[in-house]
UniProtKB/Swiss-Prot annotation:
Homodimer. It comes from Salmonella arizonae (strain ATCC BAA-731 / CDC346-86 / RSK2980). GO terms for biological process: iron-sulfur cluster assembly. This is Iron-sulfur cluster insertion protein ErpA. Belongs to the HesB/IscA family. Iron-sulfur cluster binds at C42, C106, C108. NCBIfam families: iron-sulfur cluster assembly accessory protein, PRK13623.1. It comes from the Bacteria. HAMAP family: Fe_S_insert_ErpA.
Length: 114
C-alpha cells in the first residue's frame, strides 16, 4: 500500500526505521513485522509482535521505507484508526500500539479491553 492512501493503521517512521535495523541484523530481507492481538493480559486482550516472512491470504501489509508491517484481518478490526510506533525512553525501548478502540488499558500498556 502506498504512503499516500489513507490507511486503517499507521506505521510511523520511527517504527519503520527500527524494523529496518532489526531486519538488517537478522540478514533476511524478506522479514516483515507482524502485529497481532491475542486474548490475555490483565485487561483481556494483548498486543503481540513477531517477525514473519509469510504474508497470509487476507493479511494487510503496509510498506514504509522499504519494510513491511503485516496485520491479520481479525487483529485489524481491533486496530482500525490506531498506529504502531517505536519509542526509546526511561521505560526502555519498545514498539507501542496507540489504539483508539481500547476502552481501557493496563498500567504497562501491553493489554487492553474493548
Amino acid at each position: 500500500m502506498s504512503d499516500d492512501v489513507a490507511l486503517p493503521l499507521q506505521f510511523t517512521d520511527a517504527a519503520a526505521n527500527k524494523v529496518k535495523s532489526l531486519i538488517a541484523d537478522e540478514d533476511n530481507p524478506n522479514l516483515k513485522l507482524r502485529v497481532y492481538i491475542t486474548g490475555g493480559g490483565c485487561s483481556g486482550f494483548q498486543y503481540g509482535f513477531t517477525f514473519d516472512d509469510q504474508v497470509n491470504e487476507g493479511d494487510m501489509t503496509i510498506e514504509k521505507q522499504g519494510v513491511g508491517l503485516v496485520v491479520d484481518p481479525m487483529s485489524l478490526q481491533y486496530l482500525v484508526g490506531g498506529s504502531v510506533d517505536y519509542t526509546e525512553g526511561l521505560e526502555g525501548s519498545r514498539f507501542i500500539v496507540t489504539n483508539p478502540n481500547a476502552k481501557s488499558t493496563c498500567g504497562c500498556g501491553s493489554s487492553f479491553s474493548i
